[in-house]
């Protein structure tokens, strides 16, 4: 059969490392109400203030990790698309970005123009958050509604603890963990605590451990932090790691609001000062390497760890276009339920 398309969706990237392109990208990203969940006037004012200095700073960071072919995130996502085209036998495989190009709107219209009426929408985020999964689904809904598209959607569900995903992580990281190391840090992208509190009012996010260790499935389904801990523990068990060999942290904090803890920056300092000499870092919230992994951890994080007394920080690559990951993703997408 060739009448069921697969649409992979990742976050996105500036078109280039120019300050103008980075400013345009950041404006689209930060003005998303699922990213900065404040009333429009407040959000507009805040983003305008951020865009005074941030584009130049971010442009420098992007330039430090930019590849000859372009943005690492886009290049690696394209490579995954190519591998997935060999796995997904039901129809074409396309790639869209939530921010930047190719947009979800342009790719959906392209698929419909080709005669596709069944589409599996695959947000490439293992854990659920409004600022990742929900905004992708809502953008697809907007396009369908505004263009009156006659399509049937399935949506890939969060797969933070699915065996195929954990086994793909194991296969891609085992060569690194077979070498001597002192500690493994699983650094996930952070979120403001208020994002989680809106979905689970009254749910405690305090402490360094799993906030959902004793929570109901309903609470866990909306708790990004708890899902990150489930990913980490499932991976550690799969690898046979003892509790003291690994820990969880959250990176990429923006602004002054309280974000979920423990913070990666603080953890890097702690580990260096505790005598950890060789630190492995993996970033399981990202399926493709990007500025948050390559620059934030691979460059700035490495320097910070060394300044705290550590000797070597090894950044374990994301799943990227690993064949086992593509096989796992194919299986997960085949199980995607009808939605939209």
Swiss-Prot record:
GO BP term (any one): heme biosynthetic process
Keywords on this record? Cytoplasm, Heme biosynthesis, Iron, Lyase, Metal-binding, Porphyrin biosynthesis
- The organism's superkingdom is given as Bacteria
Catalysis: reaction(s): heme b + 2 H(+) = protoporphyrin IX + Fe(2+)
Query: What is the designated name of this protein?
Result: Ferrochelatase
Q: What class of enzyme is it?
A: lyase
The task this protein performs is described as: Catalyzes the ferrous insertion into protoporphyrin IX.
Primary location: cytoplasm
Name of the encoding gene: hemH
Recorded GO cellular component terms are: cytoplasm
EC no. given is 4.98.1.1
Compartment(s) of residence: Cytoplasm
What Pfam families does this protein's entry cite? Ferrochelatase
Any idea which GO molecular function terms this record carries? ferrochelatase activity; metal ion binding
Annotated family: Belongs to the ferrochelatase family.
Q: Give residues annotated as binding Fe cation.
A: 189, 292
Pathway, per Swiss-Prot/TrEMBL?
A: Porphyrin-containing compound metabolism; protoheme biosynthesis; protoheme from protoporphyrin-IX: step 1/1
């Amino acid at each position: 059969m060739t009448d069921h398309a697969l649409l992979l969706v990742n976050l996105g990237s500036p078109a280039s490392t120019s300050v103008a392109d980075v400013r345009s990208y950041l404006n689209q990203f930060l003005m998303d109400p699922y990213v900065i969940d404040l009333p429009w006037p407040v959000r507009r004012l805040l983003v305008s203030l951020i865009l005074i200095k941030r584009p130049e700073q971010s442009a420098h960071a992007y330039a430090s990790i930019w590849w000859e072919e372009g943005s690492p995130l886009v290049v690696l996502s394209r490579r995954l698309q190519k591998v997935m085209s060999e796995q997904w036998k039901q129809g074409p495989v396309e790639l869209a970005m939530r921010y930047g190009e190719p947009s979800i709107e342009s790719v959906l219209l392209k698929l419909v123009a080709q005669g596709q009426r069944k589409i599996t929408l695959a947000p490439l985020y293992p854990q659920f958050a409004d600022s990742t999964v929900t905004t992708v689904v809502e953008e697809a809904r907007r396009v369908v509604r505004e263009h009156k598209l006659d399509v049937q959607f399935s949506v890939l569900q969060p797969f933070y603890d699915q065996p195929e995903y954990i086994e793909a992580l194991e296969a891609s990281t085992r060569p690194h963990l077979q070498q001597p190391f002192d500690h493994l840090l699983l650094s996930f992208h952070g979120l403001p605590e208020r994002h989680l509190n809106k979905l689970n009012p009254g749910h405690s996010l305090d402490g360094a451990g799993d906030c959902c260790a004793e929570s109901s499935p309903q609470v866990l389904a909306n708790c990004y932090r708890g899902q990150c801990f489930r990913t980490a523990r499932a991976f550690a068990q799969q690898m046979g790691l003892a509790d003291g060999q690994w820990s969880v942290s959250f990176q990429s904090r923006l602004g002054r609001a309280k974000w979920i803890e423990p913070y990666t920056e603080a953890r890097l300092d702690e580990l260096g000062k505790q005598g950890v000499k060789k630190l492995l870092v993996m970033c399981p919230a990202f399926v493709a390497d990007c500025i948050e992994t390559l620059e934030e951890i691979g460059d700035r994080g490495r320097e910070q760890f060394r300044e705290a007394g550590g000797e070597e920080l090894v950044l374990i690559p994301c799943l990227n276009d690993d064949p086992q990951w593509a096989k796992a993703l194919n299986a997960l997408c085949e199980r995607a339920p009808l939605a939209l």
